[in-house]
Every structure is written in structure tokens, then in C-alpha cells.
């Protein structure tokens, strides 16, 4: 009934946690015998003209590699799948009784980005926009340069950590561009951040230092 209501009321866009378009694998990953049925629901939404923001939480050895290629092939064929985001699974120490999961490393994260880039190029040629994006964390793990803000279009998957780095950098650059260079009494500022965001905060802190003589930013 809920599916019919969404279609009838044309609730759009909607967010869909896809993870994989392989029905058997989705049942295994979700530990739900009905989990494979969501794929036919996605097809119904697409046929009804409902825009889809799709998320793929990737687990190394499960739904990355060839399975990721399969999922992106299926999703990129849907005209109304307007954004597809791949994000890495978060692994904590509290996994007693659960499936053993590995975290992504430099090599496996880089492999995901390569696949994403290929399908993004395909989508850009077919639809005029990239549609397929990797979360910022993949670039950090792979030690690769983050794309520019222009790469992310309308930033449809910010809540999934896609393009947050590029957007923040652009917002700081735009704000500084509208600010006159100033000088004044020496001033020291301390900024605390996490390990993943450290390079970004250092880079924007340097931009601020260049704009304001006498400013010293220390990032921890």
C-alpha cells in the first residue's frame, strides 16, 4: 500500500538504500528473505517518473568490484536514478556474532573510485550529468585528490558525505574572495578537527592566513 501511495501522490525525489542490485546478495547482506524485492519496486518508481537518490553502502569482498559494476550498470539504465552514491561501510569494534567485515584500504578504495569514474563518465555522456559519485572518505582512504565543487553538480548526496569537502573549500574560497586583504595585530587561532578532515582544515586555514596578515592558524 505504501508503494502505491508514493506512486499515486508522486512523492519525488525519494532516497533508496540499494546496496546491490543482485537479489541473492541483497538478501544475504540484509539478512531478510524479502530484501531482493526492493529492486522491482525501484523499477516501478522509475517507470512512474519518480526521481531516485540511490545509496550503495559498500563492504569489501561483498558488493564492491564486479558486484558494484553490476549494480551501477543496472542503476545507470534507469532514467530517473538522478544520483547514485557509493559510501564505505563503517566498521566498529562491537561486532560480536556478526559477519566479519574488513575496512577499505588505499588499494580497494582506489579501485572503487576507478569504477565510479568510469560509470560517471558514461552517465555524463548519456544523460548530461555524472550521477555516480564516491563518498569523500574513499578519496581520503585512497590518498587521492578530491574533485572540485563543479564535479558534484547540485550536491544531491551531501548527507551521505559526498562532496562535503569540495563544498566547504569552495564556500571558504568564495567568502575570502569577497573579503579585502587586511592586516592588524598578530592573532593566533587554534582549530581542532578529526584526522580525516585535517588536510582540508589545514588548507583552508592557510587561505585565511594569506588573506589576513598577522593571522596564525594552528590546526590540531
How would you describe each model-predicted region?
Residues 1-79, 90-119:
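Conserved Radical SAM active-site core
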Amino acid at each position: 500500500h505504501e508503494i502505491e501511495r508514493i506512486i499515486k501522490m508522486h512523492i519525488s525525489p525519494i532516497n533508496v538504500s540499494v546496496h546491490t542490485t543482485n537479489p541473492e546478495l541483497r538478501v544475504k547482506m540484509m539478512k531478510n528473505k524479502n530484501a531482493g524485492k526492493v529492486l522491482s519496486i525501484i523499477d516501478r518508481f522509475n517507470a512512474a517518473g519518480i526521481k531516485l537518490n540511490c545509496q550503495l553502502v559498500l563492504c569489501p569482498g561483498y558488493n564492491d568490484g564486479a558486484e558494484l559494476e553490476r549494480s551501477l550498470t543496472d542503476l545507470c539504465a534507469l532514467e530517473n536514478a538522478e544520483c547514485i552514491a557509493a559510501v564505505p561501510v563503517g566498521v566498529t569494534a562491537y561486532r560480536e556474532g556478526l559477519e566479519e567485515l574488513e575496512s577499505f584500504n588505499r588499494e580497494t578504495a582506489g579501485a572503487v573510485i576507478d569504477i565510479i569514474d568510469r560509470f560517471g563518465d558514461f552517465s555524463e555522456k548519456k544523460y548530461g550529468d555524472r550521477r555516480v559519485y564516491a563518498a569523500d572518505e574513499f578519496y581520503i582512504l585512497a590518498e587521492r585528490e578530491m574533485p572540485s565543487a563543479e564535479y558534484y553538480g547540485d550536491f544531491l548526496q551531501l548527507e551521505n558525505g559526498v562532496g562535503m569537502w569540495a563544498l566547504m573549500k569552495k564556500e571558504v574560497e568564495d567568502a575570502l574572495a569577497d573579503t579585502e586583504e587586511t592586516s592588524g595585530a598578530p592573532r593566533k587561532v587554534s582549530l581542532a578537527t578529526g584526522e580525516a578532515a585535517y588536510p582540508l582544515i589545514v588548507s583552508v586555514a592557510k587561505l585565511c592566513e594569506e588573506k589576513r596578515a598577522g593571522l596564525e592558524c594552528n590546526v590540531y
